[in-house]
């Protein structure tokens, strides 16, 4: 029996006329939609929404939630995603009435406490990153990437340097990097990695030129390796007149140890929903603040949160600003959670976060390299990348290994990324997992490797114990069904 047979869609449960909620009687005159909208925007027939009782709705979504998997359910070693535990004190603080019940349209004088929190969060992020100013406006990581690149574009245009149309990105980069650069109007140039998994400095020198707007880097990179030549790379880019952009996806590996600003980066984006424990993995909301060096401050999105003698306020007087990038001022609830985390941990706690994240990753890497190929055999930072090429020769692919992990109640690691590693298995344990959990996962991975040798079919046909078996993911990606259509 599968999920489709036991759990119909909410639309399929609908019974015409069944009511789940009663609205109070209107205390304002009724008006017609046609009084406000053109006929072209008005439905000819009512929306086909499901009609259920409140109890039916509660049971439907509660049963669905029981089949979900999250950090609170079990180990979630999704590489490059930092699926760490989200402390519940964050949720308690975010639900304080003074935070949860305010509205962004309120007068600034009535939300001074909230503005103070945001300002203090900005100040903390300035210190953590080594930047000169931070804006909390971007809503997520890729949004922060795009915003940072738009600042760089505005900077070059302000200086009359319109020939700088290219952004250099490593071949190991996150996929959002080239996408963000393209959306920001840049051409993407790829710089190769060397045999050690690091940016090839010689190749960088070849591709940098007068048309270079920026170099986008993640440090440590997506292989979990620290770019030791970062200072030299910064000098190369700056001497050519370009800017250095820091993708903050992997900040968990260096937080409170080293700062991007001290490495030579001009723009930084952070993922507060990752590094600073805002819950993520369900599509949002996120928070992707960007930090900038002094010469880029004039181009920050408005408004800019400032502190004056009379209190906190938003400043719109930035004539060179790229303008708003989001209504209001960021995703406030996630920012509250991040602020709570930073204040709870303190500088010493954040340093321990980094140390344990790196320790856990190296411990797992050394334990697993006996059964899986390790393309870059060196000390890693917060994550590491194995290869399933050894298992592929036995007829077992990386995707099979990932599916088999589901039978053991583990979320699979990131697979087939970075693209420069064949049959990639990207593992990020984070700092919040115990040695017992790490050992359990290691034992399972070793068991699966042995199964690939002795009984490959059990891995190839996995998962066996999940409510939903293996799906046709290629078909789902290429021919998605994004809305319900009732059969006639």
UniProtKB/Swiss-Prot annotation:
Pfam families: GcvP2_C, GDC-P
Enzyme Commission number, as recorded: 1.4.4.2
InterPro entries listed in its UniProt record: GcvPB, GDC-P_C, GDC-P_N, GDC_P, PyrdxlP-dep_Trfase, PyrdxlP-dep_Trfase_major, PyrdxlP-dep_Trfase_small
Catalysed transformations (reactions): N(6)-[(R)-lipoyl]-L-lysyl-[glycine-cleavage complex H protein] + glycine + H(+) = N(6)-[(R)-S(8)-aminomethyldihydrolipoyl]-L-lysyl-[glycine-cleavage complex H protein] + CO2
Keyword Oxidoreductase among UniProt keywords: yes
Subunit composition and interactions: The glycine cleavage system is composed of four proteins: P, T, L and H. In this organism, the P 'protein' is a heterodimer of two subunits.
NCBIfam families: PRK04366.1
Protein's UniProt name: Probable glycine dehydrogenase (decarboxylating) subunit 2
Native source species: Listeria monocytogenes serotype 4b (strain CLIP80459)
Gene: gcvPB
């Amino acid at each position: 029996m599968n999920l489709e047979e036991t759990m119909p869609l909410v639309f399929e449960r609908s019974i015409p006329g069944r009511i789940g909620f009663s609205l109070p009687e209107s205390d304002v005159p009724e008006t017609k939609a046609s009084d406000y909208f053109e006929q072209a925007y008005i439905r000819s027939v009512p929306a086909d929404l499901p009609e259920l009782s409140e109890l039916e709705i509660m049971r439907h979504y509660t049963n669905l939630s029981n089949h979900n998997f999250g950090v609170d359910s079990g180990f979630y070693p999704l590489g490059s995603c930092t699926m760490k535990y989200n402390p519940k004190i964050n949720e308690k603080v975010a639900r304080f009435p003074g935070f949860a019940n305010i509205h962004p349209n309120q007068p600034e004088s009535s939300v001074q406490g909230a503005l103070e929190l945001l300002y203090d969060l900005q100040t903390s992020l300035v210190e953590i990153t080594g930047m000169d100013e931070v804006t909390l406006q971007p809503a997520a990581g890729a949004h922060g990437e795009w915003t940072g690149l738009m600042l760089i574009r505005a900077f070059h245009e302000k200086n009359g340097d319109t020939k700088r149309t290219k952004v250099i990105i490593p071949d190991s980069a996150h996929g959002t990097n080239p996408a963000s650069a393209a959306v920001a109007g840049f051409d993407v140039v790829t710089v190769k990695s060397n045999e050690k998994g690091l940016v090839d400095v010689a190749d960088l020198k070849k591709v940098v030129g007068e048309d270079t707007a920026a170099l986008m880097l993640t440090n440590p990179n997506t292989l979990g390796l620290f770019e030791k030549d970062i200072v030299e790379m910064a000098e190369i880019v700056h001497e050519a007149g370009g800017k250095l952009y820091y993708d903050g996806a992997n900040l968990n590996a260096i937080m409170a140890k080293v700062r991007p600003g001290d490495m030579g980066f001009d723009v930084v984006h952070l993922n507060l929903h990752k590094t600073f424990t805002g819950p993520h993995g369900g599509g949002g909301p996120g928070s992707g603040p960007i930090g900038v060096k002094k010469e880029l401050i004039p181009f920050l999105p408005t408004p800019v949160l400032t502190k004056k003698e009379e209190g906190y306020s938003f400043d719109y007087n930035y004539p060179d600003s790229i303008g708003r990038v989001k209504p209001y001022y960021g995703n406030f609830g996630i920012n509250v959670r991040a602020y709570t985390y930073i204040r709870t941990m303190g500088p010493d706690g954040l340093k321990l976060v980094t140390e344990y994240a790196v320790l856990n990753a190296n411990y797992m890497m050394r334990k697993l390299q006996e059964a899986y190929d390790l393309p870059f055999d060196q000390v890693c930072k917060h994550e590491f990348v194995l290869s399933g090429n050894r298992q592929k020769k036995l007829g077992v692919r990386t995707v099979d290994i990932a599916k088999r992990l589901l039978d053991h109640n583990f979320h699979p690691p990131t697979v087939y990324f970075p693209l420069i590693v064949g049959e990639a298995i990207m593992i990020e344990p984070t700092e919040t997992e115990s040695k017992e959990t790490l050992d359990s996962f290691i034992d399972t991975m070793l068991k699966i490797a042995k199964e690939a040798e002795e009984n490959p079919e059990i891995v190839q046909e996995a998962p066996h114990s999940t409510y939903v078996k293996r799906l046709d993911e290629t078909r789902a990606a290429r021919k998605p069904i994004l809305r319900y259509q009732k059969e006639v």
